[in-house]
Amino acid sequence: MTLMSGIPRARRFRHGAWRWTAGLAGMLAILLAPAAAQIGAQSGIVQRTRAAIADRDLRGAEQMAVRALRQSPSDAEALLALSWVGRGALAAQQLDMALRVAQDTETRILSVLHLRPLDAEPQVPLALGAAYEVQAQALAGLGARSEALILLNRALVRFGKTSIQARLQKNVHLLSLRGQPMPSLVTEEHLTDVRLTPAATLGKPLLLFFWAHWCADCKEFVRTLSTLRAEFGPRGLVVVAPTQRYGHIGARDDVPAAEERRHIAMTREEFYPLLAQVPIPLSPRNFSGYGVSTTPTLVLVDRKGLVQTYHPGVMTATELRPLLSALVKP
C-alpha cells in the first residue's frame, strides 16, 4: 500500500487514505512507520498517541487525545490523534471501543465544521474519513452491515464533494460491491493508443489495476501483474489499468494537465512496459466511482460483468492465482 508520501502536502491530503488493516500486526506496522511516510510532521500529540497504541495502551492513548481536546476542542492534530485510537481499537478487534471512539471523533469534528471547511487543511479530513471507516468496519464486525452502509451513504451525501469522497466510497464497496455489476469506466481519454472498448471486454474476465504515477507499490506490483497476465491472458483474462492526473509532479504543485500527461506516459514507459499493450483510461471519475483512495487498488470482474474481488492495496501472486483461476473458467 502506498501512503501518499510522494505527494506534496498541499495535494497529498486530497487523495490520501489509510488502507483497511485486518489485524493488529498490520496496524502496528503503520503506527510505527517513519514520520516521513505520514501526513506532515505529525509530531506532538499524534506521535505520542500512536506510540501508546503501538504499546497496546489504547486507554492511555484515548485519555491523552481527550485531554488535548479539552484544552483545544478544534485542534486538528488532537482530532487526528483521537481518530488513531479508533483505528487501533479496530485493529485489536476491540469493536465496541472502536465504535465508541470513532463516533466520538465524528461528533467532535462535526461540531467544529461550522468554524471551517472540511478541507481547510489535511488533518481533519483524515480524521473524519477514519472515523467513518472505523465505524463502518466495527458495525460490520458486530453484524450490523446494513447500519454501516446507511452511515457511509449518509456521509457521502454530505461529504461527496470533499477530499474524503473516495475513502467513503471505498468502504461502501468493501461492504457491498462483491457480486454486483462493475461500475462503468469512463473511457473518453486514454494514455496510449490502446483503447478500452465493449467488444474487447464482453464476456471476458477482467483485472482492473488502478495505479498512480508516483506510487512505489504500483511499480513493485507490476512485476506480479506481468507474471499473472502471461499465465492467464491466454485463458481470456483482460487487464485494464486506469489512472488519473493528480496535479503534481514530485514536489511541484499545479502542474498543467498536458505536462502531467507527458510525465505519466514517461513513467509508464520506464516502469510499466507491460502496460504498453493494456488500455489505460485516464480519468478522475474512475477513481471516484471505484472509491480508489489507496493505490494500487485491484478489482476482479467475472465474465458476466460482476465484481468478485475488490481489494485496496497490493496482493501477492499466491493470493491472486486461485482467484484468477476461478475467474477464467468458462
Question: Residue ranges of each PLM-predicted region?
Answer:
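Alpha-helical segment of the N-proximal tetratricopeptide repeat
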Residues: 43-67, 71-72
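Structural microenvironment flanking redox-active thiols in thiol-disulfide oxidoreductases
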Residues: 219-271, 279-286
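Short active-site neighborhood of thiol/selenol oxidoreductases, capturing the structured segment around
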Residues: 195-221, 225
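Flexible helix-coil transition and linker loops at the boundaries of alpha-helical arrays
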Residues: 69-78, 108-125
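N-proximal helix/coil linker or "cap" segments that precede and/or mark the start of modular domains
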Residues: 142-188, 199-202
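Thiol/disulfide oxidoreductase modules built on the thioredoxin-like
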Residues: 271-323
